């Protein structure tokens, strides 16, 4: 709703990135939404989702990495444990572009290209465990979010995800007119 009020594309990007994560990482083959993903991978908190500056430089090259890391607040000290960084946007794209003396369009190209490269690299890592329990209430919230995103963005895949998840919950999580709260391993309770 922040995007609808402000028309600031930053908020639209946050919605799109969040829903892309949910669709990619947190959606069951049947269409329901899983409940959680662990923070630990390989016994280390945040390892799957965090980056050392050197990793980014190796993947993107020095010039693109410098722009990418400035946009996402990556520093040698890191903002997480052991010098690792969680990517997060510190300032508006246009403001960062102005400081770096590049056009907003150029910076956006570097950011989008870098996101794809880092996502591909991250998918080569050992992923954290996922709690594959499907909770009815949380699915209701996600169905609502997907439907709302479709209304605002007009992207058909959000509507499709909402419909598939709603169908899944109605077919698998309602028995004798009663809502069942959890679904796991083919069983609803």
Where are these regions (language model features)?
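Glycan-recognition and catalytic cores of secretory/periplasmic carbohydrate-active enzymes
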Residues: 1-189
